[in-house]
Amino acid sequence: MEIDQCLLESLPLGQRQRLVKRMRCEQIKAYYEREKVFQKQEGPLKRSKPGKRQKVRFGLADMIQDAVIHHHDKEVLQLLKEGADPHTLVSSGGSLLHLCARYDNVFIAEVLIDRGVNVNHQDEDFWTPMHIACACDNPDIVLLLILAGANVFLQDVNGNIPLDYAVEGTESSAILLAYLDEKGVDLSSLRQIKLQRPLSMLTDVRHFLSSGGDVNEKNDDGVTLLHMACASGYKEVVLLLLEHGGDLNGTDDRYWTPLHLAAKYGQTTLVKLLLAHQANPHLVNCNGEKPSDIAASESIEEMLLKAEIAWEEKMKESPSAPSLAQEELYEILHDLPDLSSKLSPLVLPIAKQDSLLEKDIMFKDTTKGLCKQESQDGPPETSMTSNCGKPEQVQVMPPAPSDDLATLSELNDSSLLYEIQKRFGNDQIHTFIGDIFLLVNPFKELPIYSTMVSQMYLSPTGQRSPSLPPHLFSCAERAFHRLFQERKPQNIILSGERGSGKTQASKQIMKYLTSRASSSCTMFDSRLRHAIYIVEAFGHAKTTLNNVSSCLIQYWELQCCQRRKHITGARISTYMLEKSRVVAQPPGQGTFLIFSWLMDGLSSEEKCGLHLNNFCAHRYVSQGMREDVSTAEHSLNKERLAALKHALNVIGFSTLEVENLFVILSAILHIGDIQFTALTEADSAFVSDLQLLEQVAGMLQVSTDELASALTTDIQYFKGDVIIRRHTIQMAAFYRDLLAKSLYSRLFGFLINTVNCCLQNQDEYKSLQTLDIGILDIFGFEEFQKNEFEQLCVNLTNEKMHHYIQEVLFLQEQTECVQEGVAMETACSPGNQAGVLDFFFQKPSGFFSLLDEESQVIWSGEPNLPRKLQGLLESSNTNAVYSPVKDGNGNVAFKGQGAAFTVMHYAGRVMYEMGGAVERNKDSLSQNLLFVMKTSENVVISHLFQSKLSQTGSLISSYPSFKFGGHKSTLLSKRTASSMVGVNKNYLELSKLLKKKGTSTFLQRLERGEPATAASQLTKSLADITAKLQRGSPHFILCIKPNTSQLPGVFDHFYVSAQLQYLGVLGLVRLFRSGYPVRPSFEDFLSRYEPLASVLLGETKGQAAEERCRLVLQRCKLQGWQIGVHKVFLKYWHVDQLSDLWLQLQRKIVTCQKVIRGFLARQHLLQRMSIKQQEVTSIKSFLQSTEDMALKTYDALVIQNASDIAREHDRLRKEVHTAYHRNRQEEGTKRAEDQGGCRHVHSNSVPVPMVVDSLAQALTGPSTRPPSLHSVFSMDDSTGLPSPRKQPPPKPKRDPNTRLSASYEAVSACLSAAKDAAGEALTRPRPHSDDYSTMKKIPPRKPKRSPHTKLSGSYEEIWGPPRPSGTMGQGGRHQAPGTLSVQWARPDSVPQCTPQLPLHLPLPQGDYDDDAEPVYIEMVGNAARAGGSETDSPDQGESVYEEMKYILPEEGCGLGMLTFLPASPPLFLETRKAIILEAAEGNCQPSKDTCDIPPPFPNLLPHRPPLLVFPPTPVTRSPASDESPLTPLEVKKLPVLETNLKYPVQSEGSSPLSPQYSKAQKGDNDQLASPGFPVFNGPSRISPPATPPPPPGPPPAPCGPPPAPCGPPPAPCGPPPAPCGPPPAPCGPPPAPCGAASASCGVAPAPCRPPTHFAFPPESVLVTAAKALTNSDLPRTQPKPSSAPVPGPCSSFVKAPYSPGKTARADLRKTSSTFSPPSPYSPPNSRPLSSPLDELASLFNSGRSVLRRSAVGRRIREAEGFETNMNLSSRDEPSSSEMASETQDRNANNHGTQLSSSLSSDVTAENGNPVTNGLAEDDGCSRLCLSGMGTSSFQRNRESHTTQVIHQLRLSENESVALQELLDWRRKLCEAREGWQEALQHPEPRAPPPPPCKKPTLLKKPEGGSCTRLPSQLWDSSM
């Protein structure tokens, strides 16, 4: 069972331990099972005897490696004697010397070096023993390797040298730095050395590429140059390879890509670079690992995971989409430093952590032990935090002239003191001295540090505002801005006495900076406050000078991101903790605050558990315990302890860990109570209280015996020999106290490291370049009655800081002025600080050097320090340090056995007594005590003593700043090395080693071998602090203490004056007034003010830097500056003035950039708009070209249809001319019988609308064959596709209003000439299989008509009020058992957008008889779905009629289905298939056996359309909201040309053969109409109610102006459908017509889909005609916006324009008050006809010639704006125009007779015969006539009209000549027109034509008109 290491690390500790235990048990179990099986397989013969021991022999190489690891030195020597090879390699490729460096075996390492082992041997990762020794911090090995000649410049695979792995502050790092300094190598030259390898490879790659080498060339392992560069981190090489086309995703033989290698070896910059160049993060290597799986750090892993997500999104989108934000990536790549090679301190491996946790008996509940709790952002619950619950107060004093003391006119000590005292009395505690800030501690809380005040001091430049007084926030703001201006660290240095307010000032500065520049202000600010509180509890004490006195040096570093300019983290470094205060406190002073808080804050139960029942009895706290502590103080300490617990929880300590900390603190107190006694005469110490010792050992979790032995004896190991030495009582007490101090010091270091880990922002990438703002807070100068070694260290620290301030402010300026030749007005004496510091810190003759020498002595009975100190005082040349007591002869008299001296500090004279200084200086535990504490089972204690100390005495952090997963250094844990060392570890004496190797200058300067002492730690701490300060720019804050009693409002003049004098405030004022505090070099000046210089100087590259600086200062008009040899000398106010000028320039630059960016953005927008306009133009051009092709096809079909008509007429006239007059009644009966029976579908409930289709309704598309006459009549309005199922029924009755031909004889006679030229296409027989093609063309007898038969195309009748329930077909008693019913729903019973469509076709029962006239209805097909062309379909002209066959629907399609009632077997197919209503997009694909025929007829061939026969029905109308789920049904009326009809004026350019098509109204979307049922076209055509209709509402008009309403407006059905995209251009033969079957039939609840037909009219003039409402057959209601679907999604079938027959009119027969407003124009002679058969019967039964004279195309030949017939009706009654009745023809087709406003009172007729417009009757109940005549009058008008038409047709003698003339005129008309394409592009609406006034000449082209109808090339009679 194997588990990934990352998985174990992610689990909680408790769960992880349980999992590990279970794994361990399973492994043991599996091991025993395997052994049992193995024993069974071996058999009983091979089993060993029970008592016999087996011997296992290992090789010498394995044995010597194990001996080196476990420090078995004798065994190693024995193995080497036996022949073991000292050059043996380990598994990683390293030598035995690598193992010695790993496990700190110095003795064997020396032996191996003597045997000739290579000290520079490199393993597989190029690590040398020096690398490992530095990573594990083994300084003995480091020194040994250096002395053996190891090369410290060798680089590993990552390009790191050994120094890069040495943790800063460790002894190994100090040794290497000293060695490099000895060799003269500084850090800059070291960087050049590290860059030699990448520069060498860069040169080689350039040469290789210039010589024509392949950039992707691979070696034997498939590795390319890009692989090598990415693994090594050579950014320049990678960029070069990428520029030359390096393969980003190239793989080697193991399928590793360059991204894999860059991620594995932690090359963060290269990972970003590869991802920016579109490297694929999803590629896997041979192990199936992606780059994110092997990433070396969490930041790289997070980056790769984001890249993987972006790559997946890129794959989903277009290929051009980038995988990452390129701008962001390259922004990250700019100004990024190389990956820091400094590795963090190493951590315990997870196995070691689990091992220690299992041993830890303190943590019973390990599931909570080390689990970090969520950080709580609340402040510490203590009264020390001011104004927590109080409202925020703001108190800002107005500015005063004394805000800057440097501007005072009178300058002396008294004037300075007076100004400071005056300001202090006004609570103005802040004052400026130039750039130096002066702070006076008020000893009270002032409301000047609130958040509102901090907002007031925010500045864009960091300059002091003249309207605000001096403030601490202003100083912090200036430091923050200079951080980014100078791009170097800034240091804020606070100095002053104890109690002067340094710590509080530093806290306010950090609070301001974090709130101003923190990215997550609340979280970080809260953590920082809690961290400060923890440092205060463990690092501060209560003294007589200050209640919260700092006992250490704090250096806070706030890390700011240079690019984002916000704080990313913080870090605290502590120095010189007064750990001696734990065991002994000066008189009147207390111990650390934490012990006081524990005493007052712990409960009784907690004290009992910690054995602290009598807290005051402990020796460590009883010395400084104050007896006058009030009850309020105890309560306050309890609150402070609770706040401390909360703060520890915030930074990551759990409750159990906090309790463990308190156990350690309690153990420290109990350690101080251990007493020793002497039981023998040798004065050997023994523990007197064994019970207390056992109690302490239990708290420390160590062995009692081992602890007692470690306290009383000293055990040392030397080459296998054990040396034991007993301690005396004095020595035992010393080591006891030293253990307590060391334990507290290490615990404090552990807390500091935890705080630093918490304050590090883990979300920020560690490769981001940061700048630091340092805040230095040192313990203040102090003087007591008795000053000892601790006070000396404190005051020397202040002396050093004061000397640094004086050196920076005075000495450096004086020196630079002299060097640069600049005169300085005042000079400052350096004082005697240099002499004081030299006396103590000079080497090797300084006092601290003497003290360290004395501390090296193990134990001396007679101290030698007083004698040595006397010699030092006598030899010293300084007067700053001298002997305190001298007799009359001048001899020094010492007090007792101690040593004393007096020091003249900068702050005054202080005498120190050095008694016991040697013991206090010692700071190193014995090896025996150290080993006992390392073996503690307490995790924290074991960790504290296994960690090493830095040279400054701080605990080296074990928390990594960033992790490198899988990196080799994580395997080299120094703590595991220490823990594996046994008790027999041999410690080689350094002196012998040095004697053996010899002395050298390096060893003398190294000064190694000294024990860790307080003096050495102080020296190195001050050196470290000074080095940090020198790296940045200083900002000084001088803190003044007003009195020694800590009383608010008290100002002690003498005390304050003394502080002003030794701080040198007067000298600082004079310096800033006359000196030059700002002294940048020429290059730094030009770099800092580069924008200003570039604008002021322009192109001055040839000038010297000095001259350029001079010009800049002159043009800025500054005064008082000077130019030196290499530097510019400026006053402190010059910086603010230059910053103001730079800010003004920056604002102007920003304004210019804003304007330019706006201009570019507008240009980009215009470019995008231009591109979009081009796309729109291209689409329009495509649509126009498609429309032109459709028009060409349309014109060709017109000619072909005319030829077919002529041919067919010639044949029929010869066959049935005589029988036509004799047997019309018998033939009608015969035809009804042939099509009757079960094959006829008779509808008694659905008034089938008749659609008058003309030749203009032909398909717009190319045709392979000329369609026949019947195919012409079956053209679809909406799509223009010829449908084979939309053929007209045989011999329908004609309406005289149909203006094409009066009879087939007339058409045949007119088109006889075209028959000869048509070719084969015209001579083919007509492809009809029914009796229509074979019957004699004798008009059938007129069938009996029922007055209830309303088979009309008028919308008013279709959408009229519903019939009574007794006449509805859905009533069961009136329906035949074998009939098909169509059930319509009421429009008001369903929602407008989702009407119910239970569509049935009921057959009549009672009203049906054999004599009822059948109506033939054709099903509109959907052959061409989705606009595709069916090239392999049968010829569209070869159409054969076939009866309709119905099938039952079945579920499965989301669209609406047609449901049928039970019908007779002949009506249905055996296979029941779902009737799917095709949507416009054709989502539901047809079955493969249905070909082009829609689903209702799956077994019909494409050329055999179905034919429906409907019997008469008494129903007047159907509900307006229903639509049939069947494909639209159409009743075809054959067009009739009559000469006695008055035609309206033809629109310009319309076709002579398509008058009705030209009047087709286009809808809102300018789409063609569907000739199907109006009920299928949506619910917008509603019938008027029985009562007068309400005023019409606004009709939906999404695309164009709607026609004039002719009735109540349609109910809105939702928003109009979105227009569909452009259809593909037709290529090839036209597809089978889909017409209104799919595109315009809105019966299915399908989603909004665009239609498959063309979304544009066949001619642009039709748009004009439709919008202008010039046609006579326009609908009287608004066009429907959408069809009415069934409940479900709102059907949004794009509506198609409707044919002239589908017009909605009000049902005028219901009530006399129901009228529609007049339409602009309407044919006056239109009259009601019952059915197409009635029309034919009335036409052919007359027996006369149908064409009387050559006037068949009279309307077409009329010019625009004129009428052929000038005869007006004699009826001038006003009622005729007001009522504006609508008539019906004999087919029940309503034709509006309403006239325009100019002709409202005139009804035209031809030849002077007035035609009365009668109305149809409704069940004999009510009639409405315009003239007020009765039914008989209406009948006479109708009969007389028919008689006139037939009579005029019979008078025609030469019909063929007339029609031939018509065709010739049309051909010439189109050939003569050239710019017909341009005319299509201007479909503006036109005004209605004027009333007729003149009859034009026959076949004369109108003046000024242009035929935009047909191209000339299509007018060919041969087609």
Swiss-Prot record:
Stretches forming ANK repeats: 59-88, 92-121, 125-154, 158-189, 191-217, 221-250, 254-283, 287-316
Biased segments, Polar residues type: 1547-1559, 1672-1681, 1776-1812, 1909-1919
Protein's job: Myosins are actin-based motor molecules with ATPase activity. Unconventional myosins serve in intracellular movements. Their highly divergent tails are presumed to bind to membranous compartments, which would be moved relative to actin filaments. May be involved in targeting of the catalytic subunit of protein phosphatase 1 during brain development. Activates PI3K and concomitantly recruits the WAVE1 complex to the close vicinity of PI3K and regulates neuronal morphogenesis.
Keyword Ribonucleoprotein: no
Claim: Plastid is one of the keywords in the record: no
Domain of life from the UniProt record: Eukaryota
Expression (tissue specificity): Expressed predominantly in brain where it is present in the neurons, but not in astrocytes or oligodendrites.
PANTHER family in the record: UNCONVENTIONAL MYOSIN-XVI
Subunit structure: Binds PPP1CA and/or PPP1CC. Binds F-actin in an ATP-sensitive manner. Interacts with ACOT9, ARHGAP26 and PIK3R2. Interacts with components of the WAVE1 complex, CYFIP1 and NCKAP1; this interaction mediates PI3K-WAVE1 association and actin cytoskeleton remodeling. Interacts with KIRREL3.
Region annotation Involved in CYFIP1- and NCKAP1-binding: where it falls in the sequence: 1109-1365
Record's compositionally biased regions (Basic and acidic residues): 1218-1237
Any one GO CC term of the record: cytoplasm
GO biological process: cerebellum development; negative regulation of cell population proliferation; negative regulation of G1/S transition of mitotic cell cycle; neuron projection morphogenesis; phosphatidylinositol 3-kinase/protein kinase B signal transduction
PTM entry text: Phosphorylated on tyrosine residues by FYN upon stimulation with CNTN5. Phosphorylation begins at 14 dpc, reaches a peak during perinatal days in brain, then gradually decreases.
Name of the protein in question: Unconventional myosin-XVI
Chain residue ranges for the region called Disordered: 371-398, 1218-1245, 1259-1299, 1316-1377, 1544-1642, 1672-1734, 1759-1818, 1877-1919
GO MF annotation terms: actin filament binding; ATP binding; cytoskeletal motor activity
Family: In the N-terminal section; belongs to the TRAFAC class myosin-kinesin ATPase superfamily. Myosin family.
Every IQ domain range: 1145-1174
Stretches assigned to the Myosin motor domain: 400-1143
Pfam families assigned: Ank_2 (PF12796), Myosin_head (PF00063), NYAP_N (PF15439)
Residues noted as binding ATP in the record, renumbered to the chain: 496-503
Disruption phenotype: Triple knockout mice NYAP1/NYAP2/MYO16 are fertile and appear healthy. However, compared to wild-type mice they show a clear reduction in brain size, exhibiting a reduction in the size of the cortex and striatum, but not the olfactory bulb or corpus callosum. The total neurite length of neurons in these mice is also significantly shorter.
Gene3D superfamilies: 1.10.10.820, 1.20.5.4820, 1.20.58.530, Ankyrin repeat-containing domain, Kinesin motor domain, Myosin VI head, motor domain, U50 subdomain
